[in-house]
Amino acid sequence: MRKFVAIVLLLLCGSCALAQRSYILADGDKKDADYQKGKSQQVGLDLGLTVLANRIPIENMMAGSKPSKHLLREGPLHLQLPMDDNQTDFAVYHSEVFDRKSSINILQIDNELIVYRTMETTGNIHLLYQCTRGAYGTKKSAHAKNAPVYRLWDTPERCLLPDLELQDQMAKSEAKKCGKTDYPLLIFNDLKSYGYGEQGDEAIAHFLDTMQKYNPGKRLQADLLTPASQTYLSQVNENQLWNESMRTKIVETLSEQQDYYRTKGMPWMIGNFQIHLADKYRKATTLEELEWFLSKAAAFDAGFGLDFSAATMRQHGLTDTLLGTIKLWEQLRMNGAFSEEQKEAFKDPYGNWHIEQADSSYLIYPQYVSRRYPCHFEDDSWIWDSPYAGPFALRIAVEGKGSISGLSLRTPNGTITFPCTLKAGQYLIYDFDGSAWITDLNFNKLEEVIAQGAAVLNEGETEVTFSCEVQKEKGVLPRVTLRYITKGDWAEKNPH
């Protein structure tokens, strides 16, 4: 039987002073951000403000009927043939500017903007089709052969980028706004876009210098480390969003990233984790998912960004539990309480861990979280294969339409029944201590259930049978899934 249980004493040690504090990403609305701030302070996290100071909405790019002279452009390219004012297909000579993906596909010829829909490359010619002439209020015009053609820089948000002169003005304005806030951390994603012009890395440094000038004492974070930016940045977060489906892929790359930033002497953040509500695409974030991520942050001794909106905080039934768990893991990480052996164990991409406080020490033990088992309502039987023997927790979800009642789960070691009705859009949550609750799909408690009987699982394979009564709605059966959780042995509490 695999056993790994640890007792960790919380030791305050000065050698860990360089550990980076994690943070919650602030909402744009001030009222919501203030709500987040209160929650973040309770658990010892910073509140970070994401700053995008070089985005120009398309509706703001015009100077009368002419494009602004301060838009960032690539080129020039040149027209292969003359073009009249109604022509919607035309050709330009080859240029590497078309190697960059674009979200809007805007070209500028003199004072006319043209949006092309498709492009085909033949030899040294780019053929542009289904073009909108006189786009965004500009005037359609005829253009001569070899007329210069420019491609405007755009972003995935369908915004345009400024030239260096306008970027400096925008940076100064945004820096002054940030200086009036009390956010301790300013976050710059897509930092490379500040250096797309001819100035390159120097433009990035100039931008960060402006932000620092008006925000002394605040930490600056970006998603990219460059020679010029290193002087200004307090930490780097490459903005990788973690989720359960990417377990192995993400963890495999972390050691290389950690080594790279260590050689640069730059504190490194492990990425971002989103706590979200249930929707038609995803189930609400669980405690087990969060602790899996927290164990990886502990494994690499790295802080992280937490995408936990005020709306989600207000509606998620486990908000206080999730924040309290973050506080425990982060206290231990920040104070260097995890041993190297524990960190190596945490790096297992499939490993799940749970932490609880016990007086002045903390108990950490491994968990096994099963896949979801679909029910077919014909005395469903499965072989559950758990690395740990003993009690187990259950998560039974009902979705779609209809309901189930008279739930019963039988193992060779006993039977547990749940005298309740579980409707579509609800969970039955059964925990290790025998407590059971009906919740909504965001884990808000609706009704307590008194479970009857007891059962345990073997180490290794156990045959399990689940049965219930099914109530259709408009002839449609509900969709029911089960997931079980087991845990390793507790360690004896350290008497010191």
Predicted regions, residues:
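Sec-dependent N-terminal signal peptides
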Residues: 4-13
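Aromatic-lined carbohydrate-binding surfaces of glycoside hydrolases
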Residues: 20, 31, 35-78, 135, ...
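Glycan-recognition surfaces
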Residues: 22-34, 59-74, 155-169, 212-313
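Carbohydrate-binding surfaces of carbohydrate-active enzymes
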Residues: 43, 72-76, 296, 300-396
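Autoprocessing Asn-cyclization modules and mimics
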Residues: 49, 53-133, 137-140
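Intrinsically disordered, low-complexity segments enriched in serine, threonine, and glycine
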Residues: 92-94, 118, 133-145, 382-496
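Short conserved beta-strand and strand-loop elements enriched in small hydrophobics
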Residues: 103-111, 149, 409, 463-467
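Chitinase-like catalytic core of GlcNAc-active glycosidases
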Residues: 151-180, 198-206, 214-216
